[in-house]
Amino acid sequence: MNTTPDTPTPRALRELTPLEARILGVLVEKQHTVPDTYPLSLNALTAGCNQKTARAPVMNVSEDEVTTALDELKRLSLVMEGSSSRVPRFEHNMNRVLGIPSQAIALLTILLLRGPQTAAELRLNSARLHGFADISSVEAFLDELAARAQPLVVRLPRAPGARENRWMHLMCGDVNMADFASADAGGGADSVPPSEFEALKAEQKRLADEVARLNALVQRMASELGIDVDAPGDAS
């Protein structure tokens, strides 16, 4: 999966702080999921950083902390501040600075927001950012990110009993493989990776929201037709 000819040349970057990495992930995510409110205000960006779903780890940061991190990201050209609104709004510039295509940005974003993921989890969790045809295409982009002169992701040791390796971003620096190997071994074959658990919780919430939406639709249609859906059925 080679980058397209118009993909900008990547720049060497310093290691990011966890909050700086979270901010980038939130900006990319919201660009795709709530485009009407993107670029994001400081308030919306802080809320996205502190979001309790689809985040690992969960953070609790202030607007002052986010502002400080934004200043650093602007110095690195990773974030740009718009000037067309009375309220300052922020957008990411990852594709140009990192020199990677949108597919790779989508995968990197999920790793920034949710922590280590398998290729299958990445395909599921990145669906709203980019629709990958299959797991092989996900792995191809991951392999490219890992093979760069300054790698952006790394394949972690496979946990005992696990069928797939997990991947982790390197935007905050290198990881100690031995730490992950020992942590995975201590979890046992029956343990569920946190990223997989988060994916299951997110899917459960999505299904619950869909059921609630359909129930509200049925109630509205029944009301328009004069039908009491809560009344007991005719037993005759």
Curated annotation (Swiss-Prot):
InterPro entries reported for this sequence: DUF480, WH-like_DNA-bd_sf, WH_DNA-bd_sf
Top-rank lineage group of the source organism: Bacteria
Coiled coil: none
Positions of disulphide bridges: none
Spans through the membrane: none
Annotated Pfam families: DUF480
PANTHER family, per database record: UPF0502 PROTEIN YCEH
Family assignment from sequence similarity: Belongs to the UPF0502 family.
The protein's name: UPF0502 protein Bcen2424_5610
Species of provenance: Burkholderia cenocepacia (strain HI2424)
Lineage: Bacteria, Pseudomonadati, Pseudomonadota, Betaproteobacteria, Burkholderiales
